[in-house]
Amino acid sequence: MDGWDVLAAIIWSILVFAALCAVGSIVVYVLHSISLYRGLSACGYVDPWMAWAPVLRQYALADCAVHGMDVVCVGRTPFPGWLFRFYWAICWALMLIPYGGWILSIALHVFAEGPCWAAMYGVVDGRDSKDEMLVGYLSAIVPIIPIVKLWNAGK
Protein backbone atom coordinates (compact mmCIF):
# COMPACT_ATOMS: atom_id res chain seq x y z
CA MET A 1 0.00 0.00 0.00
CA ASP A 2 1.62 3.20 -1.15
CA GLY A 3 0.96 6.83 -0.23
CA TRP A 4 -1.68 7.33 -2.93
CA ASP A 5 -3.77 4.47 -1.59
CA VAL A 6 -3.64 5.94 1.90
CA LEU A 7 -4.62 9.36 0.55
CA ALA A 8 -7.51 7.81 -1.42
CA ALA A 9 -8.70 5.97 1.70
CA ILE A 10 -8.58 9.18 3.74
CA ILE A 11 -10.48 11.13 1.09
CA TRP A 12 -13.05 8.33 0.75
CA SER A 13 -13.63 8.20 4.51
CA ILE A 14 -14.02 11.99 4.67
CA LEU A 15 -16.59 11.88 1.86
CA VAL A 16 -18.53 9.07 3.53
CA PHE A 17 -18.50 10.93 6.85
CA ALA A 18 -19.69 14.15 5.16
CA ALA A 19 -22.48 12.26 3.37
CA LEU A 20 -23.63 10.64 6.62
CA CYS A 21 -23.63 14.04 8.35
CA ALA A 22 -25.63 15.57 5.49
CA VAL A 23 -28.23 12.79 5.56
CA GLY A 24 -28.46 12.99 9.36
CA SER A 25 -28.92 16.76 9.21
CA ILE A 26 -31.68 16.46 6.62
CA VAL A 27 -33.47 13.82 8.71
CA VAL A 28 -33.29 15.98 11.86
CA TYR A 29 -34.49 19.03 9.89
CA VAL A 30 -37.49 17.16 8.49
CA LEU A 31 -38.42 15.68 11.89
CA HIS A 32 -38.00 19.09 13.54
CA SER A 33 -40.18 20.73 10.87
CA ILE A 34 -42.91 18.11 11.29
CA SER A 35 -42.89 18.62 15.07
CA LEU A 36 -42.87 22.40 14.80
CA TYR A 37 -45.72 22.25 12.26
CA ARG A 38 -47.76 20.12 14.65
CA GLY A 39 -46.96 22.44 17.56
CA LEU A 40 -47.91 25.56 15.59
CA SER A 41 -51.14 23.88 14.46
CA ALA A 42 -51.98 22.83 18.03
CA CYS A 43 -51.45 26.41 19.21
CA GLY A 44 -53.84 27.70 16.54
CA TYR A 45 -51.21 29.60 14.58
CA VAL A 46 -52.63 30.74 11.24
CA ASP A 47 -49.56 29.88 9.12
CA PRO A 48 -48.10 26.58 10.37
CA TRP A 49 -46.53 25.98 6.94
CA MET A 50 -43.78 28.41 8.02
CA ALA A 51 -42.28 25.52 9.98
CA TRP A 52 -40.75 24.27 6.73
CA ALA A 53 -38.98 27.49 5.67
CA PRO A 54 -35.50 27.89 7.17
CA VAL A 55 -35.79 31.50 8.35
CA LEU A 56 -39.56 31.75 8.70
CA ARG A 57 -39.61 28.90 11.22
CA GLN A 58 -37.89 31.06 13.87
CA TYR A 59 -40.27 33.93 13.17
CA ALA A 60 -43.32 31.65 13.37
CA LEU A 61 -42.16 30.12 16.66
CA ALA A 62 -41.61 33.54 18.22
CA ASP A 63 -44.78 35.05 16.76
CA CYS A 64 -46.84 32.13 18.04
CA ALA A 65 -45.31 32.52 21.51
CA VAL A 66 -45.65 36.31 21.67
CA HIS A 67 -49.33 36.29 20.50
CA GLY A 68 -49.16 39.86 19.18
CA MET A 69 -48.00 41.36 22.47
CA ASP A 70 -45.87 44.50 22.36
CA VAL A 71 -44.13 43.68 25.64
CA VAL A 72 -43.08 40.20 26.77
CA CYS A 73 -42.06 39.54 30.36
CA VAL A 74 -39.38 36.94 31.01
CA GLY A 75 -39.47 36.44 34.73
CA ARG A 76 -40.25 39.94 35.94
CA THR A 77 -38.27 41.77 33.28
CA PRO A 78 -40.19 43.26 30.33
CA PHE A 79 -38.76 42.99 26.81
CA PRO A 80 -40.15 44.35 23.53
CA GLY A 81 -42.09 41.82 21.46
CA TRP A 82 -40.09 42.58 18.31
CA LEU A 83 -36.95 41.28 20.05
CA PHE A 84 -38.47 37.81 20.12
CA ARG A 85 -39.92 37.97 16.59
CA PHE A 86 -36.65 39.10 15.00
CA TYR A 87 -34.06 37.63 17.35
CA TRP A 88 -32.69 35.49 14.51
CA ALA A 89 -31.77 38.61 12.50
CA ILE A 90 -30.08 40.14 15.54
CA CYS A 91 -28.17 36.87 16.05
CA TRP A 92 -26.92 37.00 12.46
CA ALA A 93 -25.82 40.62 12.93
CA LEU A 94 -24.04 39.76 16.18
CA MET A 95 -22.06 37.03 14.42
CA LEU A 96 -20.45 39.73 12.28
CA ILE A 97 -18.75 41.16 15.36
CA PRO A 98 -15.22 39.77 15.50
CA TYR A 99 -13.82 38.20 18.67
CA GLY A 100 -16.86 37.19 20.62
CA GLY A 101 -19.84 38.09 18.50
CA TRP A 102 -20.71 34.42 18.12
CA ILE A 103 -20.85 34.07 21.93
CA LEU A 104 -23.33 36.96 22.12
CA SER A 105 -25.29 35.40 19.26
CA ILE A 106 -25.58 32.03 21.01
CA ALA A 107 -26.56 33.72 24.28
CA LEU A 108 -29.29 35.76 22.56
CA HIS A 109 -30.49 32.69 20.68
CA VAL A 110 -30.94 30.69 23.89
CA PHE A 111 -32.39 33.68 25.77
CA ALA A 112 -34.96 34.50 23.08
CA GLU A 113 -35.88 31.04 21.80
CA GLY A 114 -36.14 29.36 25.21
CA PRO A 115 -39.27 31.27 26.35
CA CYS A 116 -40.80 30.74 22.90
CA TRP A 117 -40.48 26.96 23.22
CA ALA A 118 -41.74 27.17 26.81
CA ALA A 119 -44.83 29.11 25.71
CA MET A 120 -45.56 26.56 22.99
CA TYR A 121 -45.08 23.63 25.37
CA GLY A 122 -47.37 25.33 27.88
CA VAL A 123 -50.17 25.64 25.32
CA VAL A 124 -49.71 22.12 23.93
CA ASP A 125 -49.45 20.45 27.37
CA GLY A 126 -52.10 22.67 28.99
CA ARG A 127 -49.68 23.91 31.64
CA ASP A 128 -48.26 27.26 32.64
CA SER A 129 -45.31 28.27 30.46
CA LYS A 130 -43.29 29.06 33.59
CA ASP A 131 -43.37 25.35 34.43
CA GLU A 132 -41.86 24.57 31.02
CA MET A 133 -39.12 27.23 31.10
CA LEU A 134 -36.19 24.88 31.78
CA VAL A 135 -37.24 22.53 28.99
CA GLY A 136 -37.72 25.58 26.75
CA TYR A 137 -34.16 26.78 27.30
CA LEU A 138 -32.83 23.26 26.77
CA SER A 139 -34.85 23.05 23.55
CA ALA A 140 -33.03 26.11 22.25
CA ILE A 141 -29.75 24.19 22.71
CA VAL A 142 -30.71 20.58 21.89
CA PRO A 143 -32.94 20.33 18.78
CA ILE A 144 -34.06 16.77 19.56
CA ILE A 145 -36.17 17.93 22.55
CA PRO A 146 -38.82 19.74 20.45
CA ILE A 147 -39.10 16.68 18.22
CA VAL A 148 -39.93 14.50 21.23
CA LYS A 149 -42.16 17.05 22.99
CA LEU A 150 -44.22 18.10 19.96
CA TRP A 151 -44.39 14.90 17.92
CA ASN A 152 -47.95 14.08 19.05
CA ALA A 153 -49.11 17.69 19.43
CA GLY A 154 -52.55 18.35 18.07
CA LYS A 155 -53.45 14.68 17.63
Where are each of the predicted segments found?
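Active-site loop ensemble at the mouth of alpha/beta enzyme cores that anchors a bound cofactor
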Residues: 91-95
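Membrane-interface helix caps and helix-loop-helix hairpins in membrane proteins
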Residues: 96-103
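Membrane-interface extramembranous regions at the lipid-water interface
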Residues: 3-6, 24-90, 108-155
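Short, strongly hydrophobic alpha-helical membrane anchors
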Residues: 1-13
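Alpha-helical transmembrane segments
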Residues: 15-23
